[in-house]
Amino acid sequence: IAIKETPSANFYDGLGALKGVDIIAASLGFKVINTRGFNSTSPVRSLQIIDGVDNQSPGLNFSLGNFLGSSELDIMKVEIIQGASSAYYGPNAFNGVISMTTLNPFIKPGLSIQYKFGERQLFENSIRYAEKFQNKNGEDIFAFKINLSYMQAKDWEADNMAAVDGTISSNNPGGYD
């Protein structure tokens, strides 16, 4: 309930309002959660779990925050465990765990649509569709859900189109532009 009451653009930004949690915005779509006072743009300190599954990118060996996470429409609850949790979650949980639980299609079927517009030409939309099927006796036998998200924005704009000159001179000792 504390996250829902925060004046933030999305639930992920709302986590930063919780005690002991810092959020670093590496870009518009990539947020890094840090706990225990270790603030860094590298998200290697916290373990992120979605429905009991580690959300690490195999090639990078760290979670990409909500860049590859669940849609905001599909989140049922988020638990943040601060501190070392290696005894329960393994060696990657030395600085805390972010555990997200998504909505069960058996419990919450239906259609949800969300549109967001904002500065930096932000356009974001999400769609969640879930349906359950019952047998002749009225018992639930199968359910599925589909989540689609799209975000488009200008994170930054390159306005210096001049060629880079890497020559070393007295007014440019490092050879940088």
Residue ranges and their predicted role:
Residues 37-39, 50-52, 82, 102-104, ...:
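Flexible glycine-/small-residue-rich
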